[in-house]
Amino acid sequence: MKILHFVAMISLLIFSSGAFAYRCVIDMRKIDEALSKQPAITEAQAQEVRKLRAEGEVLHNKGKHKESVEALHKALEILGVRQ
């Protein structure tokens, strides 16, 4: 029974990291789309969004998907985009 629990836990970890990886790409696309529509935010906010989006992409490419999603969600929050 312990082996079954262990296998289930490992499977969950493997699949959840893949879900984060996919989430990054979706969030980056949402940010790009929102920025292309010239949202009603200040230039300082737009710069912060671009910075967070770039940071999220770098983290994604390094395989740090949880951190990437966190940065991207901050950008989406500034843009007022639902996640």
Predicted regions located by residue number:
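Bacterial N-terminal signal peptides that target proteins for export
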Residues: 1-7
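Amphipathic, heptad-repeat alpha-helical segments
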Residues: 21-49
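Alpha-helical solenoid scaffolds that mediate protein-protein interactions
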Residues: 31-34, 38, 75-76, 81-83
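N-terminal signal peptide c-region/cleavage motif recognized by signal peptidases
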Residues: 16-18
